[in-house]
Every structure is written in C-alpha cells, then in structure tokens.
C-alpha cells in the first residue's frame, strides 16, 4: 500500500516526538492513501507555519501489517458516534463523555484508520461540543460530506513498518 504524508519539509526519519497534540486520532504520524489530500495538507502547513516548501513524502506499507495480531489497530469505516467521540476526545486531550471515554491519548492503539476531519467538520464538532447540535444532527451533516481517509501511526512498533519511497515537492 502506498501512503502519503504532507508537510512543509521532506521527512527523512519519522520522529514521533515531533508530532503535534490535539489531532483526530491522538499524537502520531499521519498519512493518507490520497496524494491530493497529502499535497493539500503540505500546502496548508506551509501557509500555517510560514516556512518551508510543500513536500509530500511517499511511504510503502505492506498490506499484511494491518492484519498483524501483534499490533493494536483501531479502524473506523465511516463517521459514526464512536468515531465522533474518539475524535472529540483526542482533539481535547481528555475524555468528554463518561459513557464513551475512548481516546488514544495514551497511545493504546499502534495504528488508527478512519475518516479525516477537515475545517468544515471541525466547525460541526465545535457546535456539538457547545451543545448546539446533537450527535444525530452531526451524523446527518457528515452523511452528505465527502470524507477523506487517514492512517495514523502512534508507536515505534507501528512506525517501523513504514518504508520511505520518495518525495515530491509541490
């Protein structure tokens, strides 16, 4: 499987300590199977930090890794209540709902796979957190949204399966 990582610089070696907090699936290294999504992230990162040039680093991941029983893998096939709670909990770095306190703050998962949150979805999540819309309303909004996908790596045990293939600049 080919995965892409968009940044404001080429990634020579994955260093999880350089990851930023408050991400969808917790502190980790994020990739996507979509080159266009990675390029958009690279361009956004350059604008945000006002430094570097858009770079998409290409990685190879053996498909069998996602079935490796020694890895703790969490997969969300679509946005649902579990996914919303998981993303909200990770973005706030504390469980928000005592009935569903699941998150990946402690890197209990080596790899997490699921829909990516964009700026429109962030707005909807904020409305939900403020109590202005309900989970069913949030899910209804997401139903008509074209979602992208991400695969995040949260531990050295997971990162070691990624092999750098190339870098493109855009």
Model-identified regions with their sequence ranges:
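Short aromatic-glycine-(Arg/Gly/Cys) micro-motifs in beta-strand/loop hairpins
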Residues: 1-23
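A short linear-motif detector with a strong N-terminal bias
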Residues: 8-11, 35-40, 130-132
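Conserved NAD+-utilizing ADP-ribose enzyme module
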Residues: 23-24, 44-49, 53-170
